[in-house]
């Protein structure tokens, strides 16, 4: 099976996207298909032995749409000609005003005498109407092709309604040519309908572009070239050629090309595209740098630790591509309704036409037929969910969050139990030296020098904490010979003229001269004597305590699961106010806890970052991973916190609740609108003097979809509200 991603031009409503999905889904060579109306992206999983991508494209073209091979952005295939959407809309407006001047407003205007001739007046209206229809020709091309393929959409409704008005106007024009009396033409209905529909579409497209802007801007953070240091000189090279270990020069105002560490110098880096925080982050030698972030101040050198394809930015862009093709359950329901909506509307319009025709009023029958086709709005149904989800994804990015699919964004609001891993999630994951104790007669700095010199030979996280502390103290490390590491116990080597060991108490097999100590203990000594002990502790992440408090306030239960020893886990749980905790938990133990909670009917969120968290993240209802997590955990998680902030858990739940509430408002409005508008267009309130003519119907339809789009925009600024709620709670 082969998976292909591409763009589809010409879709206007969810009936279009769902129609493409149904048409392709019926083909034997297609295993899976997904089409996103907003981003215009599509993917197809097909059997390459039975068909090619060209065959897939032919099926789409039969429906009246134009597939395009995927590039960096869906906007690259837009027509760059003079007839831009805004120019088309302006020409439609001018043409419509001309037709209205010749029809509805003719008695009020000083028109030339020859235009008062019904036939000549009709010919001029026809010419102007044909120009307007040409500007909106996509409605007819897509609409009639979709109708012919038995996948009618909103374009089909517009095409049928305006074509009926045009054909009847041509009949009236012929009657005017024969000097038969006529009451008027329907050219103004054709033009006004197209004007309102196209104006509504422009508002929708502008809103979509704004919502997509935050995602597409990430593309602009990806450099094409980098300055590589070769033989002491900086040489510009393609980004794809960079390898791990390459030394790069970063100039002020340039984007960091790949992930790495600061090698020489210092800098302030704008990491807002990852964390959502606007203030630059100070960086010194040895600190992490991320692709796509911006160097705001000085020139410095960095060492690449990842290639372009492995960078954090590349992972984000991959996640975005996957997320844009996903649909939430609530969106699938709306798509199903929209898929059958158009055929039902055509049926209702046809029945209403026949009823009014039987009543002996052909003109009224035609107006009702056109009004029903035009007033019905599958767009409102189709846009209700994807627009809200798209705006929510943008707001999530401003919170340093990314939802990998629409399903997780919908689920997060229902979470009622959160399980936390300890190291790297609630804590920094980098043990820091808390105290150094020495035996009688031993110098503290000398002991720290011996320990750090030895630990510098190890890549263990505890060793790094000790070495970092020694460097902060200004200690110069000594050379170590004959280094031997014993996993699970410690390390030893020759420093100067003596054998020095550093590790746990079992490594020495000697009594502990310092008594009970809390934290991670690294004993230092010779083969026969313990000279001292370095005590380390993993520091609590900023905001961890506040996040747990907020979850409690929301009525969400919390559990701490860790592979650490009972003493450390209990101490952390007590500090955070978590009553349910499990120590020395293996990956299978974590799975068991999640299974038990789910069996009790709990909606479980797992928050972690390590390789051993990957199975738990996959099993939970919503898996949240810190961005510095392993590739395995990033792959299976549902939500990624790129700012490594534990409060992202609360933010994800709050944003989910706001988004689903907005979607429900949109769907409620869309269903109510269609439930009321269609019967009124049928003429059920005719006796009360309420009747929609085609022009009013088109205005109502356009306002319906525009109102849904504008309501979705109310989610903009949600990140301010969520951040504000955190700050207000912490200050109180």
Swiss-Prot record:
Query: Which residues bind Cu(+) per the record?
Result: 13, 16
Localization, UniProt? Cell membrane
The catalytic activity of this protein is classed by the Enzyme Commission as 7.2.2.8
Gene Ontology CC: one annotated term: plasma membrane
Q: Where is the active site?
A: 421 (4-aspartylphosphate intermediate)
Residues recorded as binding Mg(2+), renumbered to this chain, are 609, 613
- Source organism, top-level taxon: Bacteria
**Enzyme class, UniProt record, top EC level:** translocase
The record lists the membrane-crossing segments as: 89-109, 123-142, 150-170, 188-208, 337-359, 366-383, 664-683, 695-713
Q: Name one GO molecular function term.
A: P-type divalent copper transporter activity
What residue ranges lie in the Extracellular compartment?
A: 110-122, 171-187, 360-365, 684-694
- Show the coiled coil region(s): none
Please give the biological process terms from Gene Ontology that the record holds: copper ion homeostasis
User: What are the protein's UniProt keywords?
Assistant: ATP-binding, Cell membrane, Copper, Copper transport, Ion transport, Magnesium, Membrane, Metal-binding, Nucleotide-binding, Phosphoprotein, Translocase, Transmembrane, Transmembrane helix, Transport
Q: How does it sit in the membrane?
A: Multi-pass membrane protein
Catalytic reaction annotation: Cu(+)(in) + ATP + H2O = Cu(+)(out) + ADP + phosphate + H(+)
Q: Which residues lie on this side of the membrane: Cytoplasmic?
A: 1-88, 143-149, 209-336, 384-663, 714-732
Which NCBIfam families does the annotation name? ATPase-IB1_Cu, ATPase-IB2_Cd, ATPase-IB_hvy, ATPase_P-type
Question: What role does this protein play?
Answer: Probably involved in copper export.
Specify the protein name.
Answer: Copper-transporting ATPase
Q: Which organism was this protein described from?
A: Helicobacter felis (strain ATCC 49179 / CCUG 28539 / NCTC 12436 / CS1)
Q: Which gene encodes it?
A: copA
